[in-house]
Amino acid sequence: MSTFQAIFLGILQGLGEFLPISSSAHLIIFPWLFGWKEHSLVFDVALHLGTLLAVLVYFWRDYIEIIVKGITQPKSDQGKLLWFIIVATIPGAGFGYFFENIVENVFRKQYLLIAVVLAVFGFILYYVDKTAKNKFTLSNMNILQAGLIGILQAFALFPGISRSGITMTTGLLLGLKKEAAAKFSFLMSAPIILGAGVVSLLKNIHDVSSQFSSFAIGFFTSAIVGFLAIHFLLDIVRKSGFKIFAYYRFLLAALILVVFLLRI
């Protein structure tokens, strides 16, 4: 893998992990568009660990307060968030553990299917953004809502859906304000990324030394871009919502269709 490819894929992961555009779809589609070889599993781990670092650094004060108050003051607003995050993590972690390899094998080269998923979820994102009644902050959230967000997060395994996209959309449907839905999506991302990253890293630890250069480049690029993506999304959500990401999904789906037809 060239340095350019490692940087480019790191940028895609950093953006796609936190913007509702599906990082997994981008990491499949763009190498296909450019005719690149499929990247290794250990490089994929590096990209995800980079975005984990991004969210931990961006929200480090929140995480410390959530953990401390979750233990010492579990009924406080911040204390409840710890248990909401735990509950929301369980369904996705379980689904990922049992079905991740199956989903990856089914979707790996199904470019048209990914295009369809991108477009369909784009319509859902647009509709929910336009019609949802955003009344509540995270302090109004309850554990059943957290559980529902977690259950639907499991579907993010399918390339084109987007973990951040489906969790934010579910939050909006449940009445959360846009910024609150985005923040909860980011906060609950750390455990699921950490769990998946550690499991994959342990399985492929022997490959790290031979691919250390691309591993390091992908890690730091996705971390830096991921940090900026979090800030960008929170800012754009305050101003204009999620519609811009729906439009992007439509354009990418159309591009995939055109390229696929030209290559027949």
UniProtKB/Swiss-Prot annotation:
The keyword Cell cycle does not apply. Its main location: membrane. It is a multi-pass membrane protein. It is found in: Cell membrane. GO terms for molecular function: undecaprenyl-diphosphatase activity. Keywords: Antibiotic resistance, Cell membrane, Cell shape, Cell wall biogenesis/degradation, Hydrolase, Membrane, Peptidoglycan synthesis, Transmembrane, Transmembrane helix. The chain crosses the membrane at residues 14-34, 40-60, 79-99, 112-132, 141-161, 182-202, 214-234, 242-262. Pfam families: BacA. It catalyses: di-trans,octa-cis-undecaprenyl diphosphate + H2O = di-trans,octa-cis-undecaprenyl phosphate + phosphate + H(+). Bacitracin is thought to be involved in the inhibition of peptidoglycan synthesis by sequestering undecaprenyl diphosphate, thereby reducing the pool of lipid carrier available. NCBIfam families: undec_PP_bacA. Catalyzes the dephosphorylation of undecaprenyl diphosphate (UPP). Confers resistance to bacitracin. This is Undecaprenyl-diphosphatase. The lineage of its organism: Bacteria, Bacillati, Bacillota, Bacillota incertae sedis, Caldicellulosiruptorales.
